[in-house]
Curated annotation (Swiss-Prot):
Protein name (Swiss-Prot/TrEMBL): Mitochondrial distribution and morphology protein 12
Similarity comment: family membership: Belongs to the MDM12 family.
InterPro entries hit by this protein: Mdm12, MMM1_dom, SMP_LBD
One Pfam family per UniProt: MMM1
Membrane protein topology class: Peripheral membrane protein
Native source organism of the sequence: Candida tropicalis (strain ATCC MYA-3404 / T1) (Yeast)
């Protein structure tokens, strides 16, 4: 299955471009720069007009880690129950609780296929117990209603899902009781495992000062403008929608032959110890500089290699599992509410991982 993205809706104004530029600029400013570089800044970022190709491989419930990421908000905190003594009603409640614990946990749309058993902390997880699929009340129309506001339309069926991604031992989940998960779970929560293939015309500009430290420190400071283009990404990613927020993380390479079969704790431990994947598969960088001596040009090459490596590291640390980004859409609802009721509006800051 695949779907089309109205990419032009993302670039209708410059808000998203400016947000990404600000994020990258902040990340680069945190770097410890080598002695031959100073004043590094991201001056421009454009998503471009060419959208990525996205093919759906699997549809199911969001990873447990995403729910854990939302438990910090006050509305998700549940009051603690106090023991009031031996009472018949309490005994009945205990029996109901035990019944709930024995019930089915989270399942996926495809019977026998469960969620990836990933652990954000990188520690090995206990052996997963197969979950009985619960009745799904999401129809194709309801799925379409979730994606429609974001300009996403269901399209024709894509290529077949790789065998290793549909292996039951590969897709598994920790057992979560209905009693524990129900307060957090919503019927509109959904997660897509997708093949993300991007070969667009995204570009960004970086301005940096090249320093010549001979015959004395900072003897020459030469501004250089670098153009980064032709970025290619081809990986398996997860896109989850829950609590009016979208979670995005890249899981593994499309043709990653090193992924073990998840049939025992040893294979799970092997995977969780692996480093996050390198998201960028290809990148091109060009320097804009005047006539200079050959030794300065050699330093320009060092600057280019440094920036490319740091950009790869930033994306790997922020977007590759067990890390993810969260796009909080509650801000949009609050802005609309403020416009409708300006006298009753209040400012709230949302922070996502």
């Amino acid at each position: 299955m695949s779907f089309d993205i109205k990419w032009e809706n993302l670039t209708v104004d410059n808000t998203i471009n400016e947000s990404i530029q600000s994020f990258l600029d902040e990340q680069f400013k945190k770097l410890s720069l080598p002695s031959y570089i100073s004043n590094l800044s991201v001056t421009d970022f454009q998503l471009g007009e060419i959208p990525p190709e996205i093919t759906i491989r699997h549809i199911g419930d969001p990873f447990d880690e995403f729910y854990e990421d939302t438990t910090d908000s006050p509305e998700t905190e549940q009051p603690k129950e106090e023991y009031t003594g031996d009472d018949d009603d309490d005994d009945d409640d205990d029996e109901d609780d035990e019944s709930d614990d024995d019930g089915p946990g989270l399942s996926t749309i495809s019977e026998g296929i469960h969620l990836l058993n990933f652990n954000r902390t990188g520690s090995p997880l206990p052996d997963a117990t197969p979950l009985s699929p619960r009745p799904m009340n999401r129809s194709r129309d309801s799925f379409q209603s979730i994606l429609h506001p974001f300009g996403v339309n269901i399209g024709p069926t894509g290529s077949e899902t790789p065998t290793n991604l549909l292996n039951q031992s590969y897709f598994s989940s920790r057992r979560v009781s209905i009693k524990q998960k129900q307060p957090l779970y919503d019927e509109n929560d959904i997660q897509l495992i997708v093949e993300f293939n991007y070969k667009g015309n995204l570009h960004m500009n970086i301005l940096v000062n090249l320093l010549v430290n001979y015959p004395s420190p900072n003897f020459i400071s030469l501004p250089i403008k670098l153009h980064i283009t032709d970025i290619e990404i081809h990986s398996i990613a997860t896109i989850a929608y829950l609590k009016k927020a979208v979670f995005l993380s890249f899981l593994c390479d499309v043709n990653d032959e090193t992924i073990p079969e998840f049939n025992n704790s040893q294979s799970i431990e092997y995977y969780t110890k692996n480093n996050p994947i390198d998201i960028i598969k290809k990148i091109k960088i060009e320097s804009e500089i005047g006539e200079v001596e050959s030794n300065i040009l050699r330093n320009v090459g060092k600057v280019e290699r440094f920036l490319v490596e740091q950009l790869r590291n930033i994306l790997r640390e922020e977007l590759a599992w067990p890390s993810w980004i969260c796009l909080d859409m509650n801000d949009d609802d609050e802005e609309e509410e403020e416009e409708e009721n300006p006298s009753e509006s209040s400012s709230t800051t949302h922070v996502g991982s």
